[in-house]
Amino acid sequence: MKFELDTTDGRARRGRLVFERGVVETPAFMPVGTYGTVKGMTPEEVQDTGAQIILGNTFHLWLRPGQEIMKLHGDLHDFMQWKGPILTDSGGFQVFSLGDIRKITEKGVHFRNPINGDAIFLDPEKSMEIQYDLGSDIVMIFDECTPYPADWDYAKRSMEMSLRWAQRSRDRFDSLGNKNALFGIIQGSVYEDLRDVSVKGLVDIGFDGYAVGGLAVGEPKEDMHRILEHVCPQLPQDKPRYLMGVGKPQDLVEGVRRGVDMFDCVMPTRNARNGHLFVSDGVVKIRNAKYKDDISPLDAECDCYTCRNYSRAYLYHLDRCNEILGARLNTIHNLRYYQRLMAGLRQAIEEGKLEHFVSEFYQRTGAAVPPITSDN
């Protein structure tokens, strides 16, 4: 993987990730394909929304279908027939989400398989091996996603262990002869001094890109913005920056303003299945009865298949009848909305008009523009 940085506007960056499997224009949003599928979508449909890279889930694909079945097909690309690049998370966040059924030690994490209850152990070395078999174009180190809230002492211990795991991940990745990209993950909760230590430690080890982890886990938005403003200026200019698990459209805008290049989140797909649809001036909750006889398109400015062909009344009808097509049409639209937003941000950076774009974005949704407060 090669990262090319074209231009900047304030802290925002316009560039691209170049892989053997294709080019990803940045800032980029990655749809989430947890089990080897973006829910309800064929790979061609996902590509048609404008997505150039997707995210796969190491933890879930390891448990089911498992490494051996994956290797029978070749790798994850062959298994799911996605032709573009794939980033896989390391399994750290999923282990964090297991709560009481997992035990974290220096060696790794012991937990119960949520599918059948079997005892399982996952460590940095195993995570690197699974992601190698998946053929991931971007591999994520194995870390502990520090929960929120966490006091300073716990956050420090967690961050320091994640740094040791980062070195172990790097060592196993290299010993496998993996020629793809490996990203480090910055931890430290909401504490700037701990984030500083994490950044320095990861940069000293050396990675192909750097992710900001441990955000979007319940902390106030102001803390997320503050940490991004503090961390991003410290990262190498020639490496991509990835904000994990984020987020709402406003979060993407604010991340880009603060220098983030990559995002992922289940929000557009999960919300689509729940009738929560993103449009140019906010949100349409299609289950609301006021859309029963609304013959207008979901979003007159959107060029997706759904908006070009169907009315709000039809989407309301499909949702009321629990028709699978409703969830699919909603998903096509939400994914296209996210890709249109990213394309708009990229163009605004190219033209040096990002803050004008941001101002218009918030004006249309009726919200105030969050300030950027750091002097970094």
Curated annotation (Swiss-Prot):
Task: Please provide an example of a Pfam family that matches this protein in its UniProt record.
Answer: TGT
Q: Which GO terms describe its molecular function?
A: metal ion binding; tRNA-guanosine(34) queuine transglycosylase activity
Annotated Zn(2+) binding sites: 302, 304, 307, 333
Region of interest (RNA binding), residue spans: 245-251, 269-273
As recorded in UniProt, its EC number(s) are 2.4.2.29
SUPFAM superfamilies annotated for this entry?
Answer: tRNA-guanine transglycosylase
Keyword check for Signal: no
Q: For binding substrate, which residues are annotated in this chain's numbering?
A: 89-93, 143, 187, 214
Reactions catalysed, as given in the entry = 7-aminomethyl-7-carbaguanine + guanosine(34) in tRNA = 7-aminomethyl-7-carbaguanosine(34) in tRNA + guanine
User: In the UniProt entry, which residues are flagged as the active site?
Assistant: 89 (proton acceptor), 264 (nucleophile)
Q: Which UniProt keywords apply?
A: Glycosyltransferase, Metal-binding, Queuosine biosynthesis, Transferase, tRNA processing, Zinc
GO cellular component, as recorded: cytosol
- Cofactor binding comment, as recorded: Binds 1 zinc ion per subunit.
**Record-stated family:** Belongs to the queuine tRNA-ribosyltransferase family.
- Xref: HAMAP family: Q_tRNA_Tgt (MF_00168)
Q: What is this protein called?
A: Queuine tRNA-ribosyltransferase
Q: Which organism is it from?
A: Erwinia tasmaniensis (strain DSM 17950 / CFBP 7177 / CIP 109463 / NCPPB 4357 / Et1/99)
